[in-house]
């Protein structure tokens, strides 16, 4: 590391919508500052997971320290890369709290999108210096002036410092580095000497344990210090080493001082011990107040995960345990289902988080799993005044005891071309949405603000939005309040027995159509037996939809060649009695494909 000068440090982040070129610009910055040699360079260097590269998204925040010579001075540039998706908005807010500036990257052909809007507002709340960057300027469809106008009018940013660049060709990259030095303010000199460091992420390393990523606000942290976490008021730990991201995590001598970004290792073994947004201080000279903005991360969406082969239960348990080491937001609870066997109830930050965990289990651990339909946390107010929070249909109390139920709602911003307005309004109406306002983003695009139940968002809202806008629509959401709703438990009965894996909590208005569609799907995927199988959807024991799987026909008179009809009749009567007995005592075996088909449909 170069000699320490707080006025020569610049901490910045990159804000961008999915696929607007954030990771590619980060690659070019690393190249231009010679942080990484050309022969070691690969695309999306900071996106370490295969899944991040394939989907073109950032899931984990990746910091990196670069040095750059400008006008005879050496500057330390700390890039704190952030996830772009709305599911990870708390991590984004903590990463932004570690910065003084941000690059707002906008695709010069596509313009401002919903997720970049959400993160820009987080940056503006923190009073960061925002530098607009128009990427993909080399595309024939690029409209730099129109996009500048969008940024000015809709976000309210001054675009006089806008940089036109192409991460593909490298055009505009030196200008970005110079703008960071000129426009992003250095960290404020600390007013106190006690250590105060913001935790913005953590990572589990199998060799050294937990690496805690910090931005030092005041004081310094060095090897041998005894530190504690202020918000969680846990036990104290000895710092075993400190390091910087160059771009790989590299241990170093000396200390991390005010304004700098790096990591430390202590004898921490679980990511749960380290909370994002917490404040680190020393035991000997503790800071008086923790940094503002800390809150516990709580899961929003829940789903059950079961192994298709029950002998894989221990492997699944191990897989979830390993994923949890690097993901403190993932919650795991063991549960059992009458039809699916033993599995886990898991909590996620949102639908993307859930998809990523499922995909990583399948890929990294080579497991075949079934996931139940995603659910949210409902509030149940009982007649005796008690309040319950449930995320699982099996926890639904006796309807006679319920005073009313409430469901979580969200504020949604949708950006769409004008021609799809009526399609989106129909979609939101179908999802029980309430339109708050409509604004013009430019002469071709609109921003629609809606309130929607979270349960309607977590099912298939994104797919349907992409479908009705031919892929041009984008949205982001933030959690709102709970509102009263007619939420009921829908049960599916197969041969008069309820199958818990198909039960779900739905709004009364949607119960009949949902029940009917599940019954129709099951008729197609459950193989016929030797007796009729009724498939029914029920609410509070009342049947609202029914389908029947017809019995397999077995010709019991095949061995009778001619002869008396009474012989045949006797055989038919015997078969009828046998079928009746089978219907009473026979078990219907439901193939795994049936569970997968229904849960995919949901």
Swiss-Prot record:
Keyword Oxidoreductase: no
EC number, UniProt record: 3.6.5.n1
Compartment(s) where it occurs, according to its Swiss-Prot or TrEMBL record: Cell inner membrane
Domain of life: Bacteria
Positions of disulphide bridges: none
tr-type G domain span: 7-188
Catalysed reaction, written as an equation: GTP + H2O = GDP + phosphate + H(+)
Keyword set includes Repressor: no
GO cellular component, one term: plasma membrane
Entry-linked Gene3D superfamilies: 3.30.70.240, Elongation factor 4, C-terminal domain (3.30.70.2570), Elongation Factor G (Translational Gtpase), domain 3 (3.30.70.870), P-loop containing nucleotide triphosphate hydrolases (3.40.50.300), Translation factors (2.40.30.10)
Keywords: Cell inner membrane, Cell membrane, GTP-binding, Hydrolase, Membrane, Nucleotide-binding, Protein biosynthesis
Membrane topology: Peripheral membrane protein
GO MF entry, a single one: GTP binding
Residues given in the record as GTP binding sites: 19-24, 135-138
GO process terms (BP): positive regulation of translation
Pfam families, per the entry: EFG_C, GTP_EFTU, GTP_EFTU_D2, LepA_C
Function: Required for accurate and efficient protein synthesis under certain stress conditions. May act as a fidelity factor of the translation reaction, by catalyzing a one-codon backward translocation of tRNAs on improperly translocated ribosomes. Back-translocation proceeds from a post-translocation (POST) complex to a pre-translocation (PRE) complex, thus giving elongation factor G a second chance to translocate the tRNAs correctly. Binds to ribosomes in a GTP-dependent manner.
Protein's name in the database: Elongation factor 4
Gene designation: lepA
């Amino acid at each position: 590391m170069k000699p320490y000068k707080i006025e020569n440090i610049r901490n910045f982040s990159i804000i961008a919508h999915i696929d607007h070129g954030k990771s590619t610009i980060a690659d070019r910055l690393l190249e231009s500052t010679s942080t990484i040699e050309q022969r070691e360079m690969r695309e999306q260097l900071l996106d370490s997971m295969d899944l991040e590269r394939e989907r073109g998204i950032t899931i984990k925040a990746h910091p990196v320290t670069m040095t750059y010579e400008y006008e005879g001075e050496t500057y330390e540039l700390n890039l704190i890369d952030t996830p772009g998706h709305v599911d990870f908005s708390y991590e984004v807010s903590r990463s932004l709290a570690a910065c003084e500036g941000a690059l707002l990257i906008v695709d010069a052909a596509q313009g401002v999108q919903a997720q970049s809007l959400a993160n820009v507002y987080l940056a503006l709340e923190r009073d960061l210096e925002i530098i607009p960057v128009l990427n993909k300027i080399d595309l024939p469809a690029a409209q730099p002036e129109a996009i500048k106008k969008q940024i000015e009018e809709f976000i309210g940013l001054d675009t006089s410092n806008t940089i036109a660049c192409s991460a593909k060709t490298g055009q505009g990259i030196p200008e970005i580095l110079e703008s960071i030095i000129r426009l992003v303010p250095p960290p404020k000199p600390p007013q106190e000497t006690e250590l105060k460091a913001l935790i913005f992420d953590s990572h589990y390393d199998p060799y050294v344990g937990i690496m805690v990523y910090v931005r030092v606000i005041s004081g310094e942290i060095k090897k041998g210090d005894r530190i504690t976490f202020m918000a969680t008021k846990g036990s104290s730990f000895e710092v075993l080493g400190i390091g910087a991201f160059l771009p790989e995590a590299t241990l170093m001598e000396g200390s991390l001082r005010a304004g700098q970004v790096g990591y430390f290792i202590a004898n921490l073994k679980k990511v749960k011990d380290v909370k994002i947004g917490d404040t680190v201080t020393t035991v000997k000279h503790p800071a008086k107040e923790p940094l503002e903005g800390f809150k516990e991360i709580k899961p929003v969406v829940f789903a059950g995960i079961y192994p298709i082969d029950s002998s894989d239960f221990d492997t699944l348990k191990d897989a979830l345990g390993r994923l949890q080491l690097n993901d403190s937001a993932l919650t795991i609870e063991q549960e059992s289902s009458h039809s699916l066997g033993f599995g886990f109830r898991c909590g996620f930050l949102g639908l993307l988080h859930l998809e990523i965990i499922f995909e990583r289990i399948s890929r990294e651990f080579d497991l075949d799993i079934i996931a139940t339909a995603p659910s949210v946390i409902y509030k149940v107010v009982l007649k005796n005044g008690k309040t319950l929070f449930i995320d699982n249909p099996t926890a639904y109390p006796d309807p006679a005891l319920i005073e009313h139920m409430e469901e979580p709602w969200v504020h949604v911003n949708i950006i769409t071309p004008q021609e799809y307005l009526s399609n989106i309004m129909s979609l939101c109406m179908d999802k029980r949405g309430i339109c708050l306002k409509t604004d013009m983003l430019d002469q071709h695009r609109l921003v629609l603000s809606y309130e929607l139940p979270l349960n309607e968002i977590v099912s298939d809202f994104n797919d349907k939005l992409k479908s009705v806008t031919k892929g041009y629509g984008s949205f982001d959401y933030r959690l709102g309040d709970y509102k009263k709703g007619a939420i009921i438990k829908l049960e599916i009965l197969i041969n008069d027995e309820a199958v818990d894996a198909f039960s779900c909590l739905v709004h009364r208005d949607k119960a009949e159509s949902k029940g009917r569609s599940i019954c129709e799907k099951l008729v197609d995927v459950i193989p016929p037996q030797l007796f009729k199988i009724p498939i029914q959807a029920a609410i509070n024991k009342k049947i609202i939809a029914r389908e029947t799987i017809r019995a397999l026909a077995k010709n019991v008179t095949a061995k009778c060649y001619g002869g008396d009809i009474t012989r045949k009749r006797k055989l038919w009567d015997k078969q009828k009695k046998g079928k009746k007995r089978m219907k009473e005592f026979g078990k219907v075996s439901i193939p795994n494909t049936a569970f997968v088909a229904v849960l995919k449909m949901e």
